[in-house]
From Swiss-Prot:
One of its GO terms (molecular function) is methionyl-tRNA formyltransferase activity. Gene3D superfamilies: Formyl transferase, C-terminal domain (3.10.25.10), Formyl transferase, N-terminal domain (3.40.50.170). Keywords: Protein biosynthesis, Transferase. It comes from the Bacteria. The keyword Transferase applies. Its EC number is 2.1.2.9. Belongs to the Fmt family. It comes from Nitrosococcus oceani (strain ATCC 19707 / BCRC 17464 / JCM 30415 / NCIMB 11848 / C-107). It holds the Pfam family Formyl_trans_C. SUPFAM superfamilies: FMT C-terminal domain-like, Formyltransferase. CDD domains: FMT_core_Met-tRNA-FMT_N (cd08646), Met_tRNA_FMT_C (cd08704). The lineage of its organism: Bacteria, Pseudomonadati, Pseudomonadota, Gammaproteobacteria, Chromatiales. This is Methionyl-tRNA formyltransferase.
Length: 323
């Protein structure tokens, strides 16, 4: 009886951990796991293992955490594992051409967008910011470019009007696992998968999210600000200044109603929301958070804080206290 295909898995965050868990539940032989080195986390800045590492330890899988795969030592170590196929999901390290050539069946990547749209590090957030109606998963054969390889399989996910980066992430992680499990048998059996070359004319990129992008610019339309709130939940969380303090906005709704007021002006305060004037329309804040406090509904916030219509919320962080 032939030995089962030797799969090497590389991934780091929860997205990848969900996919690894599903592979193990499907009884695939994971010969080794690669994940990023432990990172300082929390107030104590203690080294914290990745979610993928936790699963590897639980299942007693051989585990490797190189800081890079560009040096010959790391490449030789990986080659010695003799993988038939390498599955990559949100690993976070660049795989040099030398590494891509090691598995005879190649390296495949589970990417959280419908390629060639949103190549890069933050496809979920960029799709929400752009107001995309549909996103999805692409299973692609990796090459030397940034998410440029031929696409083996896709699965679509319609974005709900109330979806956040958190909810889309969870949906795509499960969808990615399902998509991978659908095409993996034919990849391992060397059957002819129809890999589609990407249309370069349709390519766009999803650069990593920067913290400063979280500041709400009230001169923008309410629709765009609502997208920003959804795209930056759970990180870095949309925020503004109120009374010289930083207020994080976890949930909001764009309203068509307009007001003859300076963008950022607090228009109305009621139990269902805090209405703020924007460059076009009104943004109703629904869930907020002050520094050092829990996330709360506007009603809970107003039980402890008094707000007066007419004050102006500002974008410039200045000397605002960080959450």
């Amino acid at each position: 009886m032939a030995a089962p295909p030797h799969i090497l898995f590389a991934g780091t965050p929860v997205f990848a951990a969900i996919i690894l868990r599903r592979l193990l539940e499907a009884k695939y032989h994971i010969g080794a796991v690669y994940t990023q080195p432990d990172r300082p986390s929390g107030r104590g800045r203690r080294p914290t293992p990745s979610p993928v590492k936790d699963i590897a330890i639980t299942h007693q899988l051989p585990l490797y955490q190189p800081a890079t795969l560009k040096d010959k030592g790391s490449q030789a170590q990986l080659a010695a594992l003799a993988p038939d196929l390498m599955v990559v999901a949100a690993y976070g390290l660049i795989l040099p051409a030398t590494v891509l050539q090691i598995p005879p069946l190649g390296c495949i990547n589970v990417h959280a967008s419908l390629l060639p749209r949103w190549r890069g590090a933050a496809p979920i957030q960029r799709a929400l910011l752009a107001g995309d109606k549909v996103t999805g998963i692409s299973i692609m054969q990796m090459d030397a470019g940034l998410d440029t390889g031929p696409v083996v399989h896709t699965a679509r996910y319609p974005i709900h009007p109330k979806d956040t980066a958190a909810t889309v992430h969870d949906q795509l992680a499960e969808l990615g696992a399902e998509a991978l499990l659908q095409c993996l048998p034919s990849l391992l059996e060397k059957k002819a998968n129809i890999a589609t070359l990407q249309d370069e004319s349709q390519a766009c990129y999803a650069p990593k999210i920067r913290k400063e992008e979280a500041w709400l610019d009230w001169s923008q339309p309410a629709v765009l600000l609502e997208r920003q709130v959804r795209a930056f939940n759970p990180w870095p969380v949309a925020q503004t200044q109120i009374g010289g303090k930083t207020l994080r906005v976890w949930s909001a709704a764009a309203l068509a109603q307009t007001a003859n007021a300076l963008p950022g002006t607090l228009l109305a305060v009621h139990k269902t929301g805090i209405d703020v004037a924007t460059g076009n329309g009104t943004l109703r804040l629904l869930e907020v958070q002050l520094a050092g406090k829990r996330v709360m509904t506007v009603q809970d916030y107003l039980n402890a804080h008094t707000l007066t219509p007419g004050i102006v919320l500002v974008k410039n962080p200045g000397k605002a206290k960080s959450p």
